[in-house]
Each structure stands twice: as structure tokens, then as C-alpha cells.
Amino acid sequence: MRGIMAPKDIMTNTHAKSILNSMNSLRKSNTLCDVTLRVEQKDFPAHRIVLAACSDYFCAMFTSELSEKGKPYVDIQGLTASTMEILLDFVYTETVHVTVENVQELLPAACLLQLKGVKQACCEFLESQLDPSNCLGIRDFAETHNCVDLMQAAEVFSQKHFPEVVQHEEFILLSQGEVEKLIKCDEIQVDSEEPVFEAVISWVKHAKKEREGSLPDLLQYVRMPLLTPRYITDVIDTEPFIRCSLQCRDLVDEAKKFHLRPELRTQMQGPRTRAHIRANEVLLVVGGFGSQQSPIDVVEKYDPKTQEWSFLPSITRKRRYVASVSLHDRIYVIGGYDGRSRLSSVECLDYTADEDGVWYSVAPMNVRRGLAGATTLGDMIYVSGGFDGSRRHTSMERYDPNIDQWSMLGDMQTAREGAGLVVASGVIYCLGGYDGLNILNSVEKYDPHTGHWANVTPMATKRSGAGVALLNDHIYVVGGFDGTAHLSSVEAYNIRTDSWTTVTSMTTPRCYVGATVLRGRLYAIAGYDGNSSLSSIECYDPIIDSYGLVTSMGTQRCDAGVCALREK
């Protein structure tokens, strides 16, 4: 051969795998095996060198002066034969089959035998299964077996999903110390202190005799000064547990003083006046009717931390009278009117994408709808009412993103377009709207368990094109059109008492206005004031019962879709 060729190390990608396959075949045929592991009277032939190479437990057993060093049989205690079989398969194949059924046996066994790969696989599997109903149990399980990363992941999950977590049995069964640790954490993500207070009361009521004495100790970690005066007087003052405890009353009086004597607030600063660290939520505004008197496709995002607006990719079809919701880090844009016809089509943007992503189509609704109401409950999207170009609808349908399918549900009692749809305490409320003849003040609610609609107390004012949102256990209805005037008035519905109260009006009349809650405040977005479309945004703080203006959007619009979601 001509020339000088430099030596080169060549590595094949199949060598290690080939050796493992060969050793596994030898194990299964009991060839060259020099030890037998005995578990629950079942024998597992194996090779010491393979076990020692994979497990520090076996390495110590076979290389130290332990009694098992030279024995042909080794009894393994503390695990089942079926688990031993899974672990040996991993040792010889690098593959482990983790399931919901076996993980609670597999992880402790992997810890016992010091099989790091199996332990890691089990932890990753459990992290993928985290849910509000199981995260507290997984956290304890991880702590027991010193799985630090899994323990931290479960802890963060429980903080992020606190309002859902406290609805499940695992929370109710916590010890007092565990409840204290959770509720005093700055990182639990709640829009207000209401779910924290209600979680404490729920925990105490579960075992009243044993837990009633713990209430003052727990209540000191509830940041009651950050609750609204209305909630303090309507809910906390009427709670029998509070009224019977002098220590609890002192904490309530502190909260009242915080509101009644604002000049003393600087002297009252402490753990109970420090807000929880909320997730960085952002506001999305999609489509609508622009200043050029036509539907638009513009999407803007508002970040309350920076108080800045930015543009996201445009939707694929220009739409006004559009509804928008967020679900599992995805934004859905539903129905609307493109200037020619009402739409049944739905677009989706995956907000977890590395880049800004692209909009893509999902299954269309069964009915074409403009000015429909939309909301989410659980893992589903609900859409009701709307106008198809010829008639207003009473129908409601539900979208399941897991199967990309819409299904029809029970009809409302009244056909409505321009109505608001919102969920409170697991019930869907539809508010106001226009039936083709009259602007409505009627309100009906849908129970997903029974599939039936029922009327509740009507609003004080007839409204179509109002914005609706849930904040601190009250449904707020902002602006709209009453048939004569474009409204700046706002009213709030107390779902506990089935009653309405008027709250401070916005500074600007707004019809076809969007409304959503962000970081414990109510945002009224854009709309039409009777003369022109708006780009301005008002922000309502329920604690001080007043509005403030935030940075305006770059685009004037009404009839837009509005939603909030956690920043990626």
C-alpha cells in the first residue's frame, strides 16, 4: 500500500450490545452461571461478574469477606420473585419495564440492590405520572427512598397545582406539620389566599374533634390581610370554627385592620402580608375586529412582569366574534366570523414549543358559531350559544383534545349570542347575551354531572358582549351593551349566596370586551366604546376596589379572543 497510514482506533456501536445479548442467552440456558439467587423459593441462575459489574450491592457481596462470597446459592430478602426477574432482565439487557402496577415494588428493590439505572427509570416514570391526586404521596415515597430529584419535582408540582391538590384525599390525610409546611410555602401558586384558607378549614372539618385545636396554629400561615374585605366579612366572619376561637379572631382582626387602616400597612409588613410567588402568567389577545373595519389575524401577548406587549404568529384565518381558551399550555381559537361566514373551525398553538410555533387546525365544532362563549373544565373545552348567520343557538358542545373530537351536550334554556361562559366550583355559568329580540340579564348554570341547565339569579343589568371572569369566588361581568348604551359598569356574582353586587365601574365604556384574570387581578381588554375600537387595558384590584390602566396593545380591536396562560 502506498503512503503512510496513521494508526486509528475504531469502535463499533454493536459490540457492547452483542456481549449483553450473549451473556443473557448464557443465563437463560444456565451456561457458565456460577451463582444462584434465591427469592421466595424461586431460583435465578446468574453470573457473579455480571452482577458485580452492574450493582455495587453484588460487587461488595462477591468481593468482600461476606459469608455469601463463595456460596453457590444466595438468599435475597425484601423483594418478590417477579421483581427479581425484572431486575435481572435489566442487568442483562439494559431494559426495564416500569408500570403503575410494579413501580412501588421496583423502586425499593432497585435501591436495595443499588441498581442505579432502574432507580432512575422508576423516578422518571413516577415524575411523568405526577397528578394533583398523587403528587403528595409520590413526594413522600421519593423522600423515603432518597430520590432527591423526584422529591423536588413532586414538591414543585404540588406548589404549582395547589388549588387542585387540596381537593384530593392525600391532602386531607396529611399531618398538621405537613399541612403547615405546604401552606406557609411562598412558592404555592394561587390567585388569592381563598383556596389556602378553604384548604385549612376543609382539613380541620375532616376530623373535627382531633383537629379543631390545630386551627389557630394553621391559620397563622394563611395570609388573610391579602384577602378582600368582602371575603373576610362574608365567609371568614361567618365560619363557626373562627367565631369560637379567640386566637383565630385576633388573626381576623389583624386582616381587617390592614384594610381599615391603610396608613399602618408599612408597620404591619410580615409573612402574612407577603404575597405568594405566582407563576409568570401572560395574557393573549387573538383576532377580533380591527380599526380598518374588518376581521384581523393579529395575536399579541402581554407580560405583566415587564409590562410589555409583543407579537406572536398570526392565526391562519382572520376572525372576529371569536372565542379563545388555554388548556395544558395550548391556546385554542374557536369559531368566529371571517367577513363572509360564521365558522366552526378551530386553531391551536402549542405554547410549549421551543420557538413561537405555528397555528394548526384541530377538529371543527359540530355547529358554526360566532359570538359563542367558551371555557374549560378539567381536560375539556366547552362552547355554548353563538350565531351561525341565521339563528342563535341553545346548544353546547365539548371538545376532548385527547381524541380530537367534539360531542354535543344538553341545550341551554335560552338561545344566546354574545353571552359569557365561565366555570366556578365545577359548574358552568352562561351570562347575558342576545336572543335575537332582546338583550338578556338572565343567567343559567350547567351541572356536568347531571347534564342539566338551571336558572340562577339574573344580573342587575342586561348585557350582551360583556367580558366575564372568575376572581376570588366571584364571577365578574364587565361592560357590554344594554340595547341603548355601551357600558362601563361592573357587577359581581357570589356563587355561595346566589346574589349580585355592583362594584366600581371601569373608566371607559367597553362592549365586545375581553376579560381574564392574571396574577390575582381582573383585566378588561380592548372592546368598543360606542365610537371606536380600543387598544387600552384596565386592571381591577379587588383588594382596593379600583382600576388602573396598563400598557396599551399595539392593535385597536374588539370582538377578540382573550385568555391567560403560564409563560413557557
From Swiss-Prot:
It holds the Pfam family BACK. Pathway: Protein modification; protein ubiquitination. PANTHER family: KELCH PROTEIN (PTHR24412), KELCH-LIKE PROTEIN 12 (PTHR24412:SF494). Residues 135-236 form the BACK domain. Keywords: Cytoplasmic vesicle, ER-Golgi transport, Kelch repeat, Repeat, Transport, Ubl conjugation, Ubl conjugation pathway, Wnt signaling pathway. InterPro entries: BACK, BTB-kelch_protein, BTB/POZ_dom, Gal_Oxase/kelch_b-propeller, Kelch-typ_b-propeller, Kelch_1, SKP1/BTB/POZ_sf. The lineage of its organism: Eukaryota, Metazoa, Chordata, Craniata, Vertebrata. PROSITE patterns: BTB. This is Kelch-like protein 12.
